[in-house]
Amino acid sequence: RIIDKKNQSKFSLLDVGCGYGELLKHCNLKKLKAYQGIDIVHEMITHANKKNKNRKVKFNVRNLFEEKNKYDYVICNGIFTLKSTISNKKMLTFVKRCINQFYKISLKGFAFNVMDEKVDFKSKDLFYINSNKLLPFLENKQNVKIIIDSKTIDYENYFFIKKTK
């Protein structure tokens, strides 16, 4: 959804929290100009590199906040779910900090997901948020179109932010 299907040119993609590179199964590799997966878990990156050694993709242990490169699109799936012992307030601050970085390093847009607070179960170590709490923060970003998908997977909201300029 984040990638403009009308545009037939190749694009670069940063996969934040890539794990072992599962997102690649859903990518048309012929369309990728460059793919970079980053994660903070060494074992995941080692596995991703072994699994994808014959592809023109890169996986590295890297901190998102030290990322200097620009990418057409930034995708982040699943890293805003587990908060462990962090407070909800600190987790929300982390989510917003990540969004600021996605905005800074993406040229065309970014996507991420969060768990909705309207669930029929809750766990202390998971992070839930009402999407309306993120909307004002996202709407403050200049020249963006925001799409929220809450129907694809129960209890999750997917945010697709396209840069319009």
Model-identified regions with their sequence ranges:
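Conserved beta-strand signature within the Rossmann-like core of class I S-adenosyl-L-methionine
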Residues: 106-114
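Conserved alpha-helix/loop element of class I SAM-dependent methyltransferases that forms part
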Residues: 1-9
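A short SAM/SAH-binding and catalytic strip from SAM-dependent methyltransferases
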Residues: 73-92
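Core SAM-dependent methyltransferase catalytic element
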Residues: 150-165
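Short alpha-helix
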Residues: 127-142
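A short acidic, Gly/Pro-enriched loop at the edge of an enzyme's catalytic core
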Residues: 66-74
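Conserved SAM/SAH-binding loop
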Residues: 61-65
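Class I SAM-dependent methyltransferase SAM/SAH-binding core
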Residues: 14, 20-58
